[in-house]
Amino acid sequence: MSTAGPRAGSAPGRVPTGGAALREALVALQRDLAIDEATVRRIVEGAVVDTYRRLVADDPEVQARVDLGAGSVGLFRDDGRGGSAPVEAPVADFARQAAQAAKAAVAGWAREAERERVIREGMAQKGELIDVLVERLDGALWWVRAGNLAALLPPEEQTPGEQLQRQQHLKVVVIDVRRRQRDAVVVVSRTHPSLLRRLLEQEVPELADGRVLVKAVAREAGRRSKVAVHAPEAGIDAQGACIGPRGVRIRAVVSELGEEQVQVVEWSADPAEYVASALAPAQVSAVELDNETRTAHAVVPDDQLSLAIGRSGENARLAARLTGWRIDISGESGHPRRETATSPAPEGEDAG
């Protein structure tokens, strides 16, 4: 389609761009992406001018005017008398290239707008619990959706052994928004400590209103977790509130986590008491602290030693992560110590 000269019945300078088709495309973009008319006009006009300067002449005074009703664009420049003079584009195939550039510009704007929307909505929900629908598996990656927000559940954030199914509903916590060159993706987790924290807040009114606080969470997702809780005001049983009458509240949380064992312990400002509490269900006879190395030596009855350590060191390891202390455990009769190293608490876990 050439614009080497004015077409019969057309105004000089008019760039034909497929009329009805362009008009329908622009209307659809405005509807689906909520692009206002002024923005569409600005994007299309800029793309047409850029095409003219690239193919015809680098004239800084050339401007474009889009007619959304007709689905066409006109080129003009200031005539110096307060009016405008039409500008021809005497290049074969200019109209097609201008139309392609306009559509590409709108698509690029829409892509960037979508990227910013994902970033904005994802950041607003970071750390929050959301309900999602499992949509599809892409290799080891699960894609899930919450309303109009698609999210990624990568392998490292999937609970070991948990088998997901398409169209399955589940709860996840938003942990990140990854900015990529052309888009952005929200990352969610089933293993992050914040998931357990948010699930408890959902089930325990005393947590939701601040009468009970979650001070720390340590998880080995799919297997076992420990949660340290505290009630700032006297007279409130923080541990009992989280467990609920006959364990109904904690069972609701466990059922969402695929039968992961969740143990609620009392937090204490006294590190020795806190370490003893964190080693439950084992009974602890005494705890000695080395503040310089931040090491706690716990002494337990001989028949409690295996329980304090746990299978493959699991109980002691979680207690160390929960408290932020390195914990050595020995029996009362002087059994060799079990050393349990601890590293800084992962994101979302507070040593309290």
State what each model feature region is.
Residues 1-352:
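RNA-contacting regions in translation and RNA-metabolism proteins
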